[in-house]
Amino acid sequence: QDKIDTVSARPDALVLCYPVITWGKYEHTGSRLNLIGEEQGEDYRLTNLAEQVSDDTPPTFLWTTANDNAVPAQNSLLFAKALCDHGIWCELHLYPDGRHGLGLAHESERVSEWSRLCGEFLFELGY
């Protein structure tokens, strides 16, 4: 047996920034086509992450903006709801304004607080 097979690939926590994690009504179509193509088979189901949340999903920090014109905020909202439905510890920040791809958001004092809040979230988890 390979040693790598004895180590879990499950992350201890997730940090998702304006994530592309939902297919269907709120998808970013270009991302879906690039990742899995046109077919809506097993890959479609397995990569529609809000539907893959289980009791084993790691604690998750999410942030997004309400007016992201590339990835709808519903990607984060649906994932956060699924986490709550499973009793998974999560923290969600939905900022009213900000373009997609803000990164550390130095251009927006309000949104830039996400990195500090994320640090606090991870600290509370023991990291």
Language-model segments: residues:
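Primarily recognizes the serine-hydrolase "nucleophile elbow" in alpha/beta-hydrolase
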Residues: 1-31, 40, 44-45, 49
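Loop/turn elements at helix/coil->beta-strand transitions in domains of secreted/extracellular proteins
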Residues: 10-13, 57-59, 86-91
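Acidic catalytic loop of the alpha/beta-hydrolase fold
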Residues: 22-23, 67-71
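Conserved serine/cysteine hydrolase catalytic core
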Residues: 49-57
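Short beta-strand/loop motif that positions the catalytic acidic residue
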Residues: 56, 61-64, 68
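C-terminal catalytic histidine-bearing segment of alpha/beta-hydrolase fold enzymes
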Residues: 63, 73-127
